[in-house]
């Protein structure tokens, strides 16, 4: 668990599907919208929004896989998920447009908060990427 400068625990933020995918993982908001885009299901305006805002996000913060190619490698980190730090308000605020697209297509997505989202495998100023903690045997 990481602590904020105020002394309290950091509450990380993630936007994800409400139901797990075929691998048992909860796809994040960007993955959900990108999947709709790749399937050709977005309107012209939605596709324009997706492309424009994906490009903005690409410039706004580091792609963890460019820093460490194994971060999202399913053979190495099959449960890797990204969480925003609460201080990344400029990134979190722009998620609303993605949520509107998902709602228009009947795709449920929720915001999840956690002070301990998992084992941190990558961290920068605005995000952490974590994997699920393995249960510890008792006894």
Q: Positions of the model-derived regions?
A:
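Long, contiguous N-terminal structural blocks used for assembly/anchoring
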Residues: 1-86
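Short, flexible coil/linker segments at or flanking structured domains
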Residues: 3, 90, 116-118
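Amphipathic alpha-helical interaction segments
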Residues: 64-65, 91, 106
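Acidic, proline/glycine-rich low-complexity IDRs
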Residues: 100-139
